[in-house]
Curated annotation (Swiss-Prot):
It is an enzyme of class 3 (hydrolase). Zn(2+) binds at residues 14, 16, 194, 275. The record marks 218 as: Important for catalytic activity. This is Adenine deaminase. The lineage of its organism: Bacteria, Pseudomonadati, Pseudomonadota, Gammaproteobacteria, Pseudomonadales. It comes from Pseudomonas entomophila (strain L48). Catalyzes the hydrolytic deamination of adenine to hypoxanthine. Plays an important role in the purine salvage pathway and in nitrogen catabolism.
Length: 316
């Protein structure tokens, strides 16, 4: 079944480039940039990948991202991910990147963007992988900070397909960013947002009604609100669900409790994604395989999930 799932043509719509930084590349970049790391070796770092919640993961995620300094670093990060896409027959990807993670530590916006966009261009030309880049605002920072990031992005408007919203969800509702999303839409950006991962269903309502999103990232807690579920079904709002991430961060205690197939069978346009694959133990195929192993996903369900991902693309 793994080989069949791997060969299935699919798109990935929820993947943070910084979260694809494998320990081996992290150590290589640290050496290249002469950065001292707090971990003795790759295995020690892998051993640190045990999280009780989203915040514990984010603390390590931001620490790891510190090795990304040059345009070449961002190219190598993105290219390594695209090679994984090719190996797993991901024919289209719409990754996130978090400019504030880098600009806040003095890395120029254009350095970050230059490496990523060149790799995506090479991915299209050399690997045949379609792509669209999503600029994500960090929700634990202020809306004013997000506005500054949008200012930095506007000279490179054509490099992006959408803006998004990620990082610590609790206490940072989508409504906090309504003005910057309004402005982004007026500049021609599409919009997506993380909601309903650790945050309540109310955050999903806000993302739909206030941020006017094209897709909900995560959204698994929608199932707690029947009226919300009906709206998502009626309007066919896609959910970019990340099963291994959800279990690794204790959104669900065990994969056998995950609700993705329940949502699929109720008519929700759910998709399968890896979120931060280097930290959560798998890329897209591994996420599909976990659903097969623990939830008994059928080939028909896998086909529908893969087709949903292709249908929910922002870039055609």
């Amino acid at each position: 079944m793994y080989e069949w799932l791997n060969a299935l043509p699919k798109a990935e719509l929820h993947m943070h480039l910084e979260g694809s930084l494998e320990p081996e590349l992290l150590f290589a970049l640290a050496e290249r940039n002469k950065i001292a790391l707090p971990w003795a070796d790759v295995e020690t770092l892998r051993g640190a990948y045990a999280f009780n919640n989203l915040q514990e993961f984010l603390d390590l995620y931001y620490q790891g991202a510190d090795v990304l300094r040059t345009e070449q670093d961002f190219y190598d990060l993105t290219w390594a991910y695209l090679q994984r896409c090719k190996a797993q027959n991901v024919i289209h990807t719409e990754p996130f990147f978090d400019p504030q993670t880098h600009t806040d530590r003095g890395i120029p916006f254009e350095v970050v963007l230059g490496g990523i966009t060149q790799a995506l261009k090479d991915g299209r030309e050399q690997l045949g992988i379609g792509s669209g880049l999503i600029l994500s605002f960090l929700r634990h920072l202020s809306e004013d900070e997000a506005q500054k990031t949008l200012d930095q992005a506007l000279p490179f408007r054509d490099a992006f397909v959408a803006v998004g919203l990620d990082s610590s969800e609790k206490g940072h509702p989508p409504s906090k960013f309504q003005r910057v999303f309004d402005r982004a839409r007026s500049e021609g950006f599409l919009t997506v947002a993380h909601a309903g991962e650790e945050g309540p269903p109310e955050y999903i309502w806000e993302a739909i009604d206030l941020l006017k999103i094209q897709r909900i990232d995560h959204g698994v807690r929608a199932i707690e609100d029947e009226r919300l579920m009906q709206r998502i079904i009626d309007e066919q709002i896609p959910l970019t669900v990340c099963p291994l991430s959800n279990t690794k961060l204790c959104v669900f205690e065990h994969m056998s409790q995950h609700n993705i197939l329940d949502m699929l069978e109720r008519g929700v346009k759910v998709t399968v994604n890896s979120d931060d694959p280097a930290y959560f133990g798998g890329y897209v195929t591994e996420n599909f395989h976990a659903l097969y192993e623990h939830l008994g996903m059928t080939q028909d369900q896998a086909r529908r999930l893969a087709q949903n991902s292709l249908d929910a693309r922002l870039v055609r």
